[in-house]
Amino acid sequence: MAVNIGLNLFRHELTPAEVVKKSREDRFFAREIIDGIFTDFIEFHGDRQSGDDMSVIGGIAALNGKPVTIIAIDKGIDINDKLSKRNGSPEPWGYRKAQRLMQQANKFHRPIVTFINTPGAFPGKTAEAQGQGEAIAKSILESMKLTVPMIAIIYGEGGSGGALALATSDQVWMFQNATYSILSPEGFASILWKDSKRSDEAAGVMGLTPKDLLNKNVIEYIIPESRNHPRVFNLIRKRLDDEFTRLNELTPDELIAQRRARFRAF
Amino acid sequence: MDLYENQRSTSKIKRDASVNDRIPDGLFLACPYCGTQMYNKQLGDYRVCAKCGYGFRLQARERVALLTDNFEEMDADIEMTTPDFPGYAEKLARAKSQTDLGESVLTGVANIEGEQVALGVMDSYFMMGSLGSMTGEKITRLFEYATAHQLPVVLFTASGGARMQEGINSLMQMAKVSAAVAAHQEAGLLYLVVLTDPTTGGVTASFAMQGDVTLAEPHALVGFAGARVIESTIHEKLPKDFQRVETLLENGFVDKIVPRAELGQIIAKIVKLHHRTEI
Ligand SMILES: [Zn+2]
């Protein structure tokens, strides 16, 4: 059950279309989240095959003193940053960087936490030539085999396969004003109704809000948002630590079986 | 769950249920790839363009009839509650009656040139081969069956991508099938993918690109994002063979392009070379 925090008690509940709008606003930035929750973050670059995608930030850090691997999709802060990150749309080598860091975490028995904010994987010419589909497919397949706990947090947009690539995890959490969907409401409306202007209506029927997704067991937890960001980060830090501690008690076989069963239910 | 339930044995299914057989022989057709015009009957049994080798889209049952010596269908009638999306139930019903399938994939145990395999064939005539919950369920069960019975999986992909009407559940199928692929892989079993025209979206971004061996039919269109989406994103016209398997082969994402008539032989050969032998 989603628990409303006091702040929101006197506001009306947002409509799905309003949640979509909010999810696209610059409410939280990846680096701010990382610095707010963890200490000693050290960024690692590159996929060791073809390049370094700036839209995927990865590295290691400490969570209450314990090592974790962090992988975050970032939309960027200023206009140049946003352009270089294609508004948070990773290239195949972004997903391959993520895969490399996942394997590294697995080797050193570090839990993995991903932060997701993407309209989707980048639909580009080079992206296709470099195997965007294969990159996502492999991320999903490899994360099904990881013997370390993995928690995914969608903090803005969770767009389609580009988001799923980093969310085939033991748990998925969403910020209160985040979305997770098969495609954008605009795309949905234009494909099904041949009218992208009906996107607000589409948002209403797509079931893309955290509340909808919690009801469907697509996610486990809704993170209440607040203008007081440190409060949000403290809550996430505590919960991550608790859940990783709990998940670490499982044997690798149990962990994998549980993760696969989580998706087998759909 | 009894996997033998709902099995239907069909030996050398006749092709008379297919749309193609309803096309008169004298009808003039144009090859969707090279544009060459020809009479329907010139395509022959395999329905291949005589000029460029492009394989016209087949229905799943037609493919099975052409490819296998024996086929026992599984999970023909599993029912799932479909989401209450306006118009969806009608669309599904129409697709079912048009294709003689329960979903956009046909699964079963097949004999191909003497080799026993777990076979899945997607059907682009069934709601564009989109990935619904039942599609994912049938493919997942195929992998689970193959893992339990130590069989290789041969999967022919054809898909327009996600099943929009099913929303997030469609997305979850990519993960569900991948988990079953992972278990099959860990059992040391062969997963052979045959990419057929068209394979796109969520299917490309999951099980179509997870095979140990990846074959493709000539000139099949295979990609993640739609060409129009890409063109409007990068404001550039895409070259003719963009997202054709010949380009994917060049870029390293396909093992071999095989003309349709030779597929059975090549598949059997690859499966045979994966028989476990004591050395
Ligand atoms: Zn042709």
From Swiss-Prot, chain B:
Span of the secretion signal?
none
Give the record's keywords alphabetically.
ATP-binding, Cytoplasm, Fatty acid biosynthesis, Fatty acid metabolism, Lipid biosynthesis, Lipid metabolism, Metal-binding, Nucleotide-binding, Transferase, Zinc, Zinc-finger
Name the Gene Ontology molecular function terms of this record.
Answer: acetyl-CoA carboxylase activity; ATP binding; carboxyl- or carbamoyltransferase activity; zinc ion binding
User: What are the subcellular locations of this protein?
Assistant: Cytoplasm
Pathway assigned to this chain's UniProt record? Lipid metabolism; malonyl-CoA biosynthesis; malonyl-CoA from acetyl-CoA: step 1/1
Could you tell me what reaction this enzyme catalyses? N(6)-carboxybiotinyl-L-lysyl-[protein] + acetyl-CoA = N(6)-biotinyl-L-lysyl-[protein] + malonyl-CoA
Residues the record lists as binding Zn(2+): 31, 34, 49, 52
Q: Please give the InterPro entries that the UniProt record associates with this protein.
A: AcCoA_carboxyl_beta, Acetyl_CoA_COase_Trfase_b_su, ClpP/crotonase-like_dom_sf, COA_CT_N
Chief location category: cytoplasm
UniProt KW Zinc keyword:
yes
Q: Which domain of life is it from?
A: Bacteria
The CoA carboxyltransferase N-terminal domain is annotated at 27-279
Cofactor comment text = Binds 1 zinc ion per subunit.
Quaternary arrangement and interactors, per the entry?
Acetyl-CoA carboxylase is a heterohexamer composed of biotin carboxyl carrier protein (AccB), biotin carboxylase (AccC) and two subunits each of ACCase subunit alpha (AccA) and ACCase subunit beta (AccD).
Biological role: Component of the acetyl coenzyme A carboxylase (ACC) complex. Biotin carboxylase (BC) catalyzes the carboxylation of biotin on its carrier protein (BCCP) and then the CO(2) group is transferred by the transcarboxylase to acetyl-CoA to form malonyl-CoA.
Q: Which PANTHER family match?
A: ACETYL-COENZYME A CARBOXYLASE CARBOXYL TRANSFERASE SUBUNIT BETA, CHLOROPLASTIC (PTHR42995:SF5)
Family, according to the entry, reads as follows: Belongs to the AccD/PCCB family.
Q: What is this protein called?
A: Acetyl-coenzyme A carboxylase carboxyl transferase subunit beta
Q: Which organism's genome codes for this protein?
A: Leuconostoc citreum (strain KM20)
